[in-house]
Amino acid sequence: MAEQLTSSFGAHWIPDDTPPQGQRAALHRLAAALRACTDLQMDTEAAEAELNAAAEAAEHFTARLAEAPRGRPLWGYAESSIAGSRRAQYDSSPVIGLGNPVAPPLRLSVVGDHVEGTATFGAAYEGPPGHVHGGIVSAAMDEVLGMTQSLSGS
């Protein structure tokens, strides 16, 4: 249905379900691990010694990454309308980017004649206790509405 809908409207964006390979797959894996670590850190009751050990491990891998070459080519685009490809990647997006440890990430799909977004917002996205921060909800809605606009071809 997504192909039919996007070809009808000349959309700029459709999801790419091709599994990443190589460095890009490793970047996705690292981002997922950092996301999980952040979520656990937000509400842990671990002892001081355990927290210090975790901090040392994080400092170690941060130093290791700091030694690696910097300035990787951008694998994505800020806006779908300038991507030039209907299967552009958005790995760096703070909302849908699978390569960004800050992203929940929100997964978007075309279902019938509408767009759906699915995400699990962990403790890192909490505003009022037990609730997602309104700014995070707004950012997620911006992505859903952006995809909707992109599918319109306008």
Place the predicted regions along the sequence by residue:
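Terminal targeting signals and extreme-terminal segments of soluble enzymes
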Residues: 1-154
